[in-house]
Each structure stands twice: as C-alpha cells, then as structure tokens.
C-alpha cells in the first residue's frame, strides 16, 4: 500500500473526550458538596441523574477508593457495618471539582461531536448487505 502523501492532520485525540472516570468523579464530588453521603446514596444519585444508567458496583467502589487515595474525599464507617461507609469532600476535592467544572463543558461538547460522527459511521453499515 503506498504511503499517504496527504495525511489528515489530527487536531484532537480520544484522550481529550470525556472519560467514564471523570463523569463518576464529577458526579460524586458534586453530590458531596451537599454534605456527607453513603456509597449507595451516591450510586442511586448517579443512576437517577442518568435516567436509569448506572455504574458497575466494583468500578464505582474503585473510583471512590481512588478519590480517597488522592485526598479528594474522606471516608468513615457508620457503626460496625462495613457497608455503611459514608464520604465527605475535602478541600483538595473541591479544587479538583473546580478544575473539572472548567474543563468538562468543552470535553462534553467534544464527546458529543465524536459520538455523533461515530453514530453516522455505524449507520452506513446498517444499510449494507452483509451476506
């Protein structure tokens, strides 16, 4: 195959599209701005906000752990029940949230453009005879 003499210039990369972890982090921190929340409350908040689309429980737990390890949230147990863990946002979490609040609107717009283009591309194959 001959080398492309006129390559298309890449103006952006997929790394600049919204990532699932950023959506979860944003939703968790925004919810915690209203006060402490339990793991299950935040999970329900996300599912409700996205009209029934939720987060895999193990992935959600890993994101909460990552936010804790980064110092963006604190976590405590309510009594002896290890499942009654509640979280609070920290000053570092507020700064991270402010950063995301500045960056996310453009990332979401970019993601919409990418997904619209991908949707159009997929439609081409729906019209093909793939026998």
Question: Where on the chain are the PLM-derived regions?
Answer:
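DNA-recognition alpha helix
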Residues: 40-52
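Basic amphipathic alpha-helical segments that dock to polyanions
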Residues: 60-67
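Short capping segments at the starts of secondary-structure elements
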Residues: 21, 31-41
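Intrinsically disordered, low-complexity serine/threonine- and proline-rich regulatory segments
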Residues: 1-22, 83, 101-107
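Amphipathic alpha-helical dimerization/coiled-coil segments
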Residues: 98-131
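Basic, amphipathic "hinge/linker" alpha-helix immediately C-terminal to the N-terminal HTH DNA-binding motif
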Residues: 82-101
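Beta-hairpin "wing" of winged helix-turn-helix
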Residues: 70-88
């Amino acid at each position: 195959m001959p080398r492309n003499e006129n390559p298309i210039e890449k103006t952006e990369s997929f790394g600049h599209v919204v990532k699932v972890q950023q959506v979860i982090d944003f939703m968790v921190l925004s919810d915690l701005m209203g006060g402490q929340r339990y793991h299950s409350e935040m999970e329900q908040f996300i599912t409700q906000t996205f009209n029934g689309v939720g987060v895999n429980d193990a992935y959600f737990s890993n994101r909460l752990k990552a936010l804790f390890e980064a110092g963006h949230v604190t976590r405590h147990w309510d009594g002896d029940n290890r499942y009654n863990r509640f979280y609070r946002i920290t000053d570092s979490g507020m700064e991270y949230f402010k950063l995301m609040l500045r960056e996310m609107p453009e990332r979401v717009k970019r993601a919409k453009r990418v997904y619209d283009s991908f949707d159009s591309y997929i439609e081409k194959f729906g019209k093909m005879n793939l026998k």
